[in-house]
Amino acid sequence: MSLAGTLWAATATAAGPAVPLWLGRRTGRGKEFSARLGERSGIAGLARPPGRLVWLHGASVGETQSVVPLIQALRLARPDLALLLTSGTTTSARLLAARLGGAAAAPERSGALPENPGVLHQFLPLDRPAWVRRFLDHWRPDLALFVESELWPNLLAALGRRGTPAALVNARLSARSARRWALVPGLARQMLGGFRLVLAQSAGDAERLARLGARDPAVPGNLKWAAPPLPADADELARLRTLVAGRPVWAMASTHEGDEALAAAADRAARERFADLLTIIVPRHPERGAALAGTLPGAARRAAGQDPDAAIWLCDTLGELGLVCRLAPLVVMGKSFLPPGGGQNPLEPARLGAAVLFGPLMQNFADIALRLVAAGASRQLAGPEALAAEITSLLNDPPGLARMGAAAARLAAEEAGVLDRVMNALAPLLPAP
């Protein structure tokens, strides 16, 4: 183990006594489920199914959305395999329950997914050696698949000692993250070199991963292209379309702190041209809704059962971005204008035929953003000061909005084969029946 890895293990062990207090604070803020706190220390909340088990880890909502089509493909190709999905956020647990669990799922209490009994969810244990050992002793995975970029030194080292094969799927590494990892080159080599297979999102990601120690990363493409369109209730969509008929509509999606103020400022400026403008704000974390409502005087709030009959509609409910992206022909991506940025997934609205705008800070989705812009499906703005003018211009040009949406649909169709390429690459690592 590298010196940095040894220091990390010692620090994680020493920090153990302080973890319950930290978890308690997170629970109070809605970031942990009190009934499932044991999972964070490796105490399983469910029994391990018999037979072979493949474990997939996706840190948060974005990774969970990427991995759902992979889960479905694995279930179809290998119904004999049990699948364990871990994540680290309550929002991702709720999303997975909504996508795979059905009405009987209760993510606040259990990781069971009744509609897909061969798929289980658990929260990832914190990276303390004893807790990692407890987690692996219980689940005994035959293969571990890590999605995108969240890597934990003690966890990967424990898998290596047990001889459990691991792969890094849909891997991404921004230039900024690569520079940070280069400060601890031994630890980077230790973690990345332990993967039997690395599948990168883009050629740039593959190059950066290889420089830090990944062995021969392949580039099958980005699994985000394989994700199904975000769902929406058809009856509710029809009702809302009737309510907003005749109004120009735009949305800011997956907003983070500071984005809502930008949306409100753009709303005020664009309203000089469109007096009946509807601005929809969709916070990435719906639990922020109550606090946000206090900063948006007069806004209607979805979580309070209010319809979009005000200037601004705060859609602070989980799993309704698909509804909003079908309602608004123009969607602006949050987390792309203010530092540190990183962006949110522009494919979600683009796949649904919405024109998409984003700011200069799209480093977490750089390849997708470049391709959407090149295809004429999206536009990247230099900064927030350009937002109101661009919104006004596009809402004044419905045919132009439609052309951008059609371009996005064509590009998504061209990338439809990425899931097959990923499955073919994983096939040699899957455990024998």
Per-range role (PLM):
Residues 1-27, 189:
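Short hydrophobic helices that act as membrane-entry/anchoring signals
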Residues 155, 259, 320, 344-345, ...:
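Conserved sugar-transfer catalytic core signal across GT-A, GT-B, and GT-C glycosyltransferases
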Residues 20-234, 255-257, 270-272, 284-285:
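Active-site and donor-binding regions of nucleotide-sugar-utilizing enzymes
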